[in-house]
């Protein structure tokens, strides 16, 4: 199936469901408590992440779509933390505050990558009047192309049928990530996205592919669904619609590091693609590709349009191309396990020219893998002025990633990549121009880790500034 990315910016999606805050306390354990036979964790890092339905909304927003989120919270620090974290990624929150209940919070204590304990702070929202949620849905319907109901059985979706009916009257597709075995609650939905175990909890264990398809088709008919998407982990996904042959999408994950939140990514990308105008089949294809990306990351994660573009082109499967920092760290670790020498350079690369290509080819010859760190648009403006860059970040990275000499491309927001270099610690740091090695950002960190720093010459007479001036003078 040949699928192109839609313009997610014109997609509006409302997510309604059980929102929660995931808290993580990290620290070393050096002794056993004298009070009880338990380890003492000296907490040195605290992290907070939106979870549940909030993670679905984050996945939608990460694509550039307009994500709205409705859910139930308390009036407490956890609710404020959720709103703060979500506003940072442009999710529009419209929570219903319930003063008698705490915001659902899950606190995990970890040491040396091991979870020692999880503490859940929740009472559930059973019995809470759903009318304010209905009102928020009604107000949002004219502005959205899809409604997602994210059910974690915490009470926000206890009255799900009126929500489905509101959307159907407005001709807005309803996508549901179900919970439990009572699918009668979801009658009339456009699409359900159960995983295999959730599906088999309703229809019984399926011995083979034929049995899965037959029982799935029966479920679609019984509950008046438009479609059913069964996510099947390493076996991919299967889309079932009455009157159409089943569509099986094999997994695109090359390596699996963490499946946390993969279901949220699937329904988030699927809804955003539908709202942007893609067909259901095309949207499922994109959701499957996105799932293949996020399971290669650690922890609950989202996928960017660039990552999704790479995935559907097949580059993500090879472990190369445009990446975020987390993906890059994993790729570099794997390269080092293979005994490969990692070279890193950086720049704006606004209008790629022969000098750039020659420089990058020479840098690549110095090792086995080449990382190119690229200034963001905001960083470029600060360094070069308001009229730069000529080409936006995404286009600059895609062009660089297409070069044979370049293995990995990663963006950075700061004026220099010093922090990024300190995190990656390449074996060789390279910079072009008339710098002295000690003047190069990140050189001290690389030297301290036992690495090398080298300056390469640029091709004389070729520069982005000269090209821009030639165009202005009418010689381009």
From Swiss-Prot:
Gene behind this protein: hldE
Single GO cellular component term: cytosol
InterPro entries: Bifunc_HldE (IPR023030), Carboh/pur_kinase_PfkB_CS (IPR002173), Cyt_trans-like (IPR004821), PfkB_dom (IPR011611), RfaE_dom_I (IPR011913), RfaE_dom_II (IPR011914), Ribokinase-like (IPR029056), Rossmann-like_a/b/a_fold (IPR014729)
Naturally occurring in which organism (per UniProt): Yersinia pestis
Similarity comment: In the N-terminal section; belongs to the carbohydrate kinase PfkB family.
Residue ranges, annotated region (Ribokinase): 1-318
Job description of the protein: Catalyzes the ADP transfer from ATP to D-glycero-beta-D-manno-heptose 1-phosphate, yielding ADP-D-glycero-beta-D-manno-heptose.
Cytidylyltransferase: annotated segments: 344-476
GO biological process: ADP-L-glycero-beta-D-manno-heptose biosynthetic process; lipopolysaccharide core region biosynthetic process
Enzyme Commission number: 2.7.1.167, 2.7.7.70
Superkingdom as given in the UniProt entry: Bacteria
Protein name per UniProt: Bifunctional protein HldE
Pathway annotation: Nucleotide-sugar biosynthesis; ADP-L-glycero-beta-D-manno-heptose biosynthesis; ADP-L-glycero-beta-D-manno-heptose from D-glycero-beta-D-manno-heptose 7-phosphate: step 1/4; Nucleotide-sugar biosynthesis; ADP-L-glycero-beta-D-manno-heptose biosynthesis; ADP-L-glycero-beta-D-manno-heptose from D-glycero-beta-D-manno-heptose 7-phosphate: step 3/4; Bacterial outer membrane biogenesis; LPS core biosynthesis
The keyword Kinase appears for this protein: yes
